[in-house]
Regions:
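Residue at a conserved register position within TPR or TPR-like alpha-solenoid repeats
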Residues: 43-44, 71, 78
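Generic start-of-chain signal for non-secretory N-termini
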Residues: 1-6
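Repeat-mediated protein-protein interaction surfaces in helical alpha-solenoids
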Residues: 9-28, 48-58
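Conserved structural position within tetratricopeptide repeats
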Residues: 61-62
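Structural register within alpha-helical repeat arrays
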Residues: 39-40, 74
Length: 79
């Protein structure tokens, strides 16, 4: 049983953000899956950082160009 799932999720999200920043700046090229990009987009959207959320959506769509979920996330950001 997990001791504190909220804390583990928060730490996992923090690690995803770090990996995303490295990918964005061309440092070490970690693989981020489609779900990771969705979480990153949601993170920046919740922080009201729409330009960064849009960049994350674009990077996600570069790696997963046929992802309906990422297309919908991007469309939601544009509304």
């Amino acid at each position: 049983m997990r001791e504190n799932p909220y804390r583990e999720d928060k730490e996992e999200l923090r690690e995803l953000i770090i990996q995303y920043q490295h990918l964005k700046h061309g440092r070490s090229h970690p693989f981020l899956d489609e779900d990771a990009f969705e979480r990153i987009i949601d993170y920046y959207d919740e922080k009201d950082d729409l330009p960064e959320a849009m960049i994350a959506a674009e990077l996600g769509l570069e790696q997963f160009p046929y992802s309906a979920n990422l297309m919908i996330k991007k469309a939601d950001l544009l509304l």
